[in-house]
């Protein structure tokens, strides 16, 4: 028996979410080692550990809700795909602009200059704009009308805390 269209959509969403996430994790880990070897400093109040659970957990919860909720209108799935893909482009543009400085953790190497190219010319934190867009897109694609907003609120709070930590660390490095 062939899997339903809904099952195939959810499988495609899972691949769209978790394959790039794995690639990003490998790149971030490699860059973290490089940054620390160059004398990088991590602030003690970073929320990385919680984010590293909440981020994939949010997508997983949305996929489970989507499986339980059933098929979504194709137009909503398509809109979610467009939002997700656009967000991924913004995020990857930020990753490319940061180069070897991009990590999952806040690591500041004393003496490094602030990146002001790519999307950083227009946005202070384009990577996080991309992350929020990924969550919105996934919520639309899966029909996660409960876990989507909950994930956005919860992860939004974590991002707010993370940005504060990052700003303090960057300000301290420029002194």
Regions found by a protein language model. Give the residues of each.
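Cytosolic-biased juxtamembrane loops and peripheral soluble domains of multi-pass membrane proteins
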Residues: 26-47, 70-175
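Hydrophobic alpha-helical topogenic segments used for membrane insertion/localization
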Residues: 15-19, 53, 57, 82
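Long, highly hydrophobic alpha-helical transmembrane signal-anchor segments
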Residues: 1-4, 45-76
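Alpha-helical transmembrane segments of integral membrane proteins, especially early/N-terminal helices
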Residues: 11-15, 43-49
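Aromatic-acidic/polar surface patches that form glycan- and anion
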Residues: 8, 24, 49
